[in-house]
């Protein structure tokens, strides 16, 4: 039997146990259960006394880790982890996870202490962000073993601390403030090669467009050195307090975790939640009206921008005291429009991750979707028609201005290909949106 102590903002919340047969269980600490600050680690692991042995325990902790088997393999080799099973990986890199979770070995405590960090110069930052090319987990080249982080997702990413204008490696229990993403590169598929070498510019523009259109998204900036180009995204699961002297971790989880699902079921086509399931789930939000409105608005935004990867792990909730929750900002938005043509995809190949309702069956193909399908979906999920119409009309009236406003935020060396591919296709769908509304 092996255990890891689970902490939330330096308060002991419970214990993760792995039995000799590989079975996992979780037990909340009794003092945590009695605390007015108590909240569940996950909605799939509700506050209760005694051991929780459901499959959701394994799935929750597994979802704290990177999806990529290659990244997991690098963590095993870098830290000589016993295996690439979630428990063994989190024993090595669980000190700074998504949300407020810190995982430590028995006997080691998460102390509330002052912020500590090591500043990075340009050469050190470059070395840190190119280490994965030497088969080292991204960001984990420091000889100081206390810098071990876990950032979920499929993309090469790490996390760093920003202090003023300086990028830093946090030390001790100091959290990180930014997710750092490198270009995705080329993805080989059976019938196409998806060129996402400019994914940094792609995501930056998608976030800028979402922000201009009134959607809550994190701030982002492109960072460059002579050898790297990366996207630094402000973590919305961190918050400065006490006039910048304390950096808090905010409890949150993605929807795979909230639904108790493995990451292999993040797509609706693989059994994961779709629009109907998520809209029903958001009825329980502490801000249900706002969250349901924003979620449906984001569905339209994904269509307009060709953002085809809106699966359950790309939506998250804040976990609030007592078990209440609300939607976090939207994140991990990348358009598929820049990969059209050449050895890439055809427009007819682009499909949304979550289907829309149609007269017959479901619609996922971006080129086959019209405003009426959003209205049909709204009806199916008990979302008021007038609100869905208001969302569609808002996009119809504001997309060109949002594109122009986003353009003014771009750095001078921004990819012209990414800009043209996203905005030109977005304007084509915007024209379809306007025509579709006129036809209603």
Describe each model-derived feature in a short phrase.
Residues 1-312, 316-440:
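Phosphate/dinucleotide-binding and metal-coordinating scaffold of catalytic cores
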């Amino acid at each position: 039997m092996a255990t890891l102590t689970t902490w939330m903002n330096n308060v002991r919340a419970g214990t993760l146990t792995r039995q000799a047969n590989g079975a996992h269980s979780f037990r909340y600490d009794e003092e945590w259960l009695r605390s007015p600050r108590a909240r569940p680690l996950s909605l799939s692991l509700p506050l209760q006394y005694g051991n929780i042995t459901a499959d959701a325990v394994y799935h929750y902790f597994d979802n704290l880790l990177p999806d990529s088997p290659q990244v997991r393999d690098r963590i095993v080799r870098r830290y000589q982890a016993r295996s690439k099973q979630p428990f063994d990986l989190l024993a090595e890199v669980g000190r700074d996870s998504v949300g407020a979770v810190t995982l430590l070995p028995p006997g080691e405590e998460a102390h509330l202490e002052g912020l500590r960090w090591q500043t990075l110069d340009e050469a050190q930052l470059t070395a840190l962000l190119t280490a994965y090319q030497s088969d080292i987990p991204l960001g984990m080249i420091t000889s100081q073993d206390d810098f071990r982080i876990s950032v979920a997702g499929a993309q090469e990413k790490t996390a760093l601390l920003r202090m003023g204008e300086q990028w830093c490696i946090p030390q001790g229990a100091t959290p990180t403030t930014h997710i750092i993403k490198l270009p995705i590169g080329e993805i080989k598929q059976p019938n196409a090669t998806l060129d996402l070498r400019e994914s940094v510019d792609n995501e930056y523009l998608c976030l800028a467009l979402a922000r201009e259109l009134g959607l809550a998204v994190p701030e982002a900036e492109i960072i460059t050195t002579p050898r790297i180009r990366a996207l630094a995204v402000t973590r919305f699961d961190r918050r400065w307090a006490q006039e910048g002297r304390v950096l808090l971790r905010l409890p949150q989880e993605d929807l795979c975790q909230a639904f108790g699902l493995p990451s292999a079921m993040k797509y609706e086509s693989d059994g994961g939640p779709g629009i109907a399931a998520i809209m029903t789930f958001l009825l329980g939000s502490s801000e249900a009206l706002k969250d349901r409105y924003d979620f449906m608005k984001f569905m339209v935004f994904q269509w307009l921008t060709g953002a085809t990867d809106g699966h359950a792990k790309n939506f998250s909730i804040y976990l609030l005291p007592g078990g209440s929750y609300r939607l976090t900002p939207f994140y991990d938005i990348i358009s598929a429009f820049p990969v059209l043509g050449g050895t890439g995809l055809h427009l007819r190949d682009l499909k949304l991750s979550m289907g829309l309702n149609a007269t017959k069956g479901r619609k996922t193909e971006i080129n086959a979707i019209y405003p009426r399908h959003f209205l049909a979906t709204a009806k199916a999920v008990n979302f008021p028609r007038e609100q869905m119409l208001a969302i569609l009309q808002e996009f119809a009236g504001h997309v060109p201005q949002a594109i122009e406003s986003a353009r003014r935020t771009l750095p001078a060396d921004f990819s012209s290909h990414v800009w043209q591919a996203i905005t030109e296709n977005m304007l084509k769908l915007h024209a379809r949106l306007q025509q579709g509304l006129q036809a209603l």
